[in-house]
Structure formats: C-alpha cells, structure tokens
C-alpha cells in the first residue's frame, strides 16, 4: 500500500480495502511471467533479514519549496497554504517539512503556466516567505519494507548508493512508521538511481 499511496501505479490502494478489512491475503502476479509465484500481501508478515522488499518510481512531479524563519511558531501557516491549493483546485502528493521550511510535491500535469503563476503569486502574498521556489521535472523513488524498522542505516545505505552514482537528492522524506523512504531526484537520473538502489538491497 505504501507504493500505491506514493502515487506509483503498482496497485491502487483502494483496491486492497475489502481484502484488508476481511483479513484476506492478496497475491499480485506478473502478466509477463504468470508462472512466477508473485507477491503475497497480508496484514502481517514475518520480517526477514532483508530490510527492503520493494522499490518503485514515478515521473511527472514538481516541488514547491517554502522557507520562513520561525514558521513553526506562526499560527495558521499550514492552513493558509492548503487554502491556496484548494482555491486553485490543486491536490498535493506529499508535504515533507522542517522547522522553518516546507515542500509541496504536486503532479506537474496540474500546473499550466497560468495556474503556476497564480499559485506562486498567491503563496507569496498569503505566506510572505523568505524563500519561494519551484522545481520541475522530478521523479519520486519509494523504497519500502517492514524490516527497515529494525535495521539501522537503511537511509545511509540508500543515500550512499545514490552518491556513488553522483545523483543529487532534491528531497528526502521518511514517515514515522519507518517502513518507507521517499527520494526526489531529477527525472533524467531516475533509471540510474533505481539500478543503484537495486544493487544495494537486492544484490544477491
């Protein structure tokens, strides 16, 4: 579900809901290799030594970086940000944040030139940020695995693998559940990044 929720066309997350509620395992098969046993999705599983069980990526994202000193102390900052998106009928995919900054990740196909100009102007007016910039043509890579909870250094291994290939990270986000890590990179580096991560976690 983490891979689907991240916006990648692996499996629609709502398709799992009936099976999840009834505690029914689901098997995903490969149409190009129907005799392969496939992937079993269950409500619980035994965590083996491998910390990562899946890697997926998708293109067509843009990120908007907003920075403002003492942003975390400003009441209603997040609400005003979301109101700007709502007024322009824009949905966001991810919103990683720090103490003084926040990044909005959107699907690029929502952003015509007119919409983008209006969005940036309204964010500037409503939020009065110290810095506001948009980055286009991003790919998002998601790695998932319940074993990441017990394994120290998965993030370090991932970033080291990307660094060896001279792949710059535009953004990184890890949820508090510790079962997934998302990386944002330039789309032209997507294939190289996927191969580097596969070599790191599935080298055998």
Q: Which role fits each region the language model picked out?
A:
Residues 1-176, 180-204:
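C-terminal catalytic "cap/lid" subdomain
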């Amino acid at each position: 579900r983490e891979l689907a929720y991240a916006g990648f066309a692996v499996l629609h997350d709502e398709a799992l809901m009936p099976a999840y509620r009834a505690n029914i395992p689901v098997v995903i098969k490969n149409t190009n290799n129907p005799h392969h046993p496939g992937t079993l999705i269950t409500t619980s599983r035994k965590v083996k030594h491998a910390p990562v069980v899946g890697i997926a990526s998708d293109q067509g994202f843009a990120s908007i970086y907003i920075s403002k000193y003492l942003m975390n102390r400003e009441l209603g900052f997040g609400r005003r940000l979301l109101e700007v998106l709502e007024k322009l009928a824009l949905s966001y995919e991810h919103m990683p944040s720090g103490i003084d900054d926040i990044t909005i990740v959107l699907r690029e196909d929502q952003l015509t030139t007119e919409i983008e100009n209006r969005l940036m102007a309204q964010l500037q007016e409503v939020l009065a940020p110290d810095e506001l910039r948009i980055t286009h043509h991003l790919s998002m890579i998601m790695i998932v695995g319940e074993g990441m909870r017990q394994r120290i250094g998965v993030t370090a291994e991932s970033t080291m693998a990307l660094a060896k290939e001279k792949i710059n990270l535009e953004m990184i986000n890890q949820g508090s559940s510790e079962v997934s890590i998302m990386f944002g990179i330039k789309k032209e580096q997507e294939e190289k990044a996927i191969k580097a991560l596969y070599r790191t976690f599935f080298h055998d």
